[in-house]
Amino acid sequence: MKKISRKEYVSMYGPTTGDRVRLGDTDLILEVEHDCTTYGEEIKFGGGKTIRDGMSQTNSPSSYELDLVLTNALIVDYTGIYKADIGIKDGKIAGIGKAGNKDMQDGVDNNLCVGPATEALAAEGLIVTAGGIDTHIHFISPQQIPTAFASGVTTMIGGGTGPADGTNATTITPGRANLKSMLRAAEEYAMNLGFLAKGNVSYEPSLRDQIEAGAIGFKIHEDWGSTPAAIHHCLNVADEYDVQVAIHTDTLNEAGCVEDTLEAIAGRTIHTFHTEGAGGGHAPDVIKMAGEFNILPASTNPTIPFTKNTEAEHMDMLMVCHHLDKSIKEDVQFADSRIRPQTIAAEDQLHDMGIFSITSSDSQAMGRVGEVITRTWQTADKNKKEFGRLKEEKGDNDNFRIKRYISKYTINPAIAHGISDYVGSVEVGKYADLVLWSPAFFGIKPNMIIKGGFIALSQMGDANASIPTPQPVYYREMFGHHGKNKFDTNITFVSQAAYKAGIKEELGLDRVVLPVKNCRNITKKDLKFNDVTAHIDVNPETYKVKVDGKEVTSKAADELSLAQLYNLF
């Protein structure tokens, strides 16, 4: 067999086993763990290449042939960092491995047949990840959705009804009528969507009615009163209907302290938002909750990574988002109680330790909806620069850290909200919500986004040009965004109760409608690469944080990767 140099191989087929790739301008280096393709039998589209009739393409149609094949993709996922062809059929991932023509090639997987009906997308040299999942959405403006989508987020979970004050402050779509309106509005968008109902209710029939109306879970928020009674009854109904509860705890400790909230939770699973506390929660020690086995702890992106500007920008954000008045002394004291540099500094290291498990945005309510992915990788890079390689790493790479951080916005939020059977990773059988990245732009600007197996967004040049690449090149909606395609390629998530009762038919929904499940039988140990439990303590006077008796903190960064190098403003 004729051999070519490794450099020539990479330029033609992308990196293979043992090759290392830098992510953006970070210090994070991945190493390809294995290559599922067969050397000498790689498939590639183009002039003089192999995807041709009688070569890598079979000439007879079959029920097994793919709709789309991504060739020689470098997959970065919680399942591994490896090279493979990805086959898509009927909107789902049909196979991952070696694609081609079994009649002519060795090692072709049975479910990766390239045939007359197969489109080809050249992924050699590109990184493929699962679409991001943002679980902390204030649905204040619909313009958030395309902004998030362009960043690589393909699923948004939260609540709201538009720019009402309740929505500006809390991620809640309250009541049957509002849920109906939001479920119908969801039809318009290239984005998977799920809505959280109001959990601040101690009368259980009112809670049940919202789940039966299509909510995928509850949000308990202090602005509506995060009392032990509300927490207890909300979790009762969540257990009954198998839905998740997200909570923003009681900053002012009006109805109890963090210990009282944990007592009301009583060991039941709950998803804590902005668990550090600057976004809200028991002052000064809500961060303690992150170490508990039944807590699924998340960060929102205004506090990660910790920089020299973090503290200063939070005051103004807080006053606006929670309808506070700088002329009222008590409102200013409320804001001051939430912004603690010491706990923010600890948050970065708690992510690196795998104690904090999920990242999200808090969109237009202190967080930036288009920066979940970027800020996750900035945090990973900042931590590597400050603390060095993780002890779990093997070889001259950062693969363990990369898997830890990609899990925070893909598989872990999917597990937390009962949608991991459908989305959240690059695995066979899941919906093909995939993001393609050039390594140089990884984490900051995707090349292309495939939604439900069809291209929905891409960087694209002048439509009047003779080729697709002349300037101006920017994100443009593709055919997956238009017409009835968006009904087949996007999911509206609802409760099992609403799904079984026929909510799709009742509301006349055209989109794919699927039920959430397995929300109540999980603990932190089910979260990938971020399952560490620990005893966390906060000094009530200095706000310093200790984990199992050892102080944890980090420095405020002066400069970040994935920042001004890639952006005009």
UniProtKB/Swiss-Prot annotation:
Residues reported in the UniProt entry to bind substrate: 221
Residues where N6-carboxylysine is found: 219
Protein name per UniProt: Urease subunit beta
E.C. numbers: 3.5.1.5
Protein localization: Cytoplasm
Keyword set, alphabetical order: Cytoplasm, Hydrolase, Metal-binding, Nickel
Coarse class of the protein's main subcellular location: cytoplasm
Source species: Helicobacter felis (strain ATCC 49179 / CCUG 28539 / NCTC 12436 / CS1)
EC category name: hydrolase
CC annotations in GO: cytoplasm
Residues the entry annotates as binding Ni(2+) 2: 219, 248, 274
Residue positions binding Ni(2+) 1: 136, 138, 219, 362
UniProt similarity note: Belongs to the metallo-dependent hydrolases superfamily. Urease alpha subunit family.
Pathway assigned in UniProt: Nitrogen metabolism; urea degradation; CO(2) and NH(3) from urea (urease route): step 1/1
Gene Ontology BP terms: urea catabolic process
Catalytic residues identified in the record: 322
Pfam families linked: Amidohydro_1, Urease_alpha
Cofactor requirement: Ni cation
Ranges for domain Urease: 131-569
Reactions this protein catalyses: urea + 2 H2O + H(+) = hydrogencarbonate + 2 NH4(+)
Cofactor note: Binds 2 nickel ions per subunit.
Segments passing through the bilayer: none
